[in-house]
């Protein structure tokens, strides 16, 4: 048994048993992946996967138990590699934050400024992506901290801390007819072409749920990944925009009017995620504390380092 075999078992569950994707994620060949699985099953004397021909469909009960053990072993191996840095280089290094465009552009600047004043020898790297990509970066060690409104709080292998709650607001050109509608309703918004976030990011599910509850089907003419792109197309006259309320800036006042929609759409929560059970440098803990002053450093460490209490579930 070796670490590569355990990584393959873990990655197979993460990639929905698609061995091509497993090979891509681990920078190896599909034939090599299959060989490692076969050799591990022969060594242990169990079948790890449920198969249909050559295709993997899921995990057997022994396979599920092995996956849980593999996660713990690989996480502890990662901790061993981090141990020397923790004792020799705790106030300098690189803090890698995986986050969405909206948080990187509008929410993080004052926090990062305050962080740099505390840790001038720590360089900050921002990696922008979708919530799914952010979650993957936390799992594979590509990021120390993940920040997003979706996914992070639902993953039992991550420790998630709330940062702040936010709502969507409606961005319209100045003097648009909707500025005269009071109170603003979903029915009124649905009469206009709509521009908003694409599926899976920045609270798009809240928008869809609100319209669905009313039996409305808005004409979403364009969806995008970040607020600045949405603003560009609203300015061009393609439609009205539903954007995160924190995406406002002074420059838009001459072009747009923002309309309050807190009574129409449910609130969203921005979460900060860490890989559960993983040793971190002091400046990682302090960054979380800067974002959530209601938690002490001891409480943050306790929540992040405690083992998950529920079984790992990759839709096994």
From Swiss-Prot:
Residues 1-59 form the HTH lysR-type domain. Disulfide bonds: none annotated. GO terms for biological process: cysteine biosynthetic process. The keyword Ion transport does not apply. Keywords: DNA-binding, Transcription, Transcription regulation. Residues 19-38 bind DNA. One of its GO terms (molecular function) is transcription cis-regulatory region binding. The keyword Transcription applies. InterPro entries: LysR_subst-bd (IPR005119), Tscrpt_reg_HTH_LysR (IPR000847), WH-like_DNA-bd_sf (IPR036388), WH_DNA-bd_sf (IPR036390). SUPFAM superfamilies: Periplasmic binding protein-like II, Winged helix' DNA-binding domain. May be an accessory regulatory protein within the cys regulon. Belongs to the LysR transcriptional regulatory family. PANTHER family: HTH-TYPE TRANSCRIPTIONAL REGULATOR, HTH-TYPE TRANSCRIPTIONAL REGULATOR CYSB-RELATED. This is HTH-type transcriptional regulator cbl. It comes from Klebsiella aerogenes. The gene is cbl.
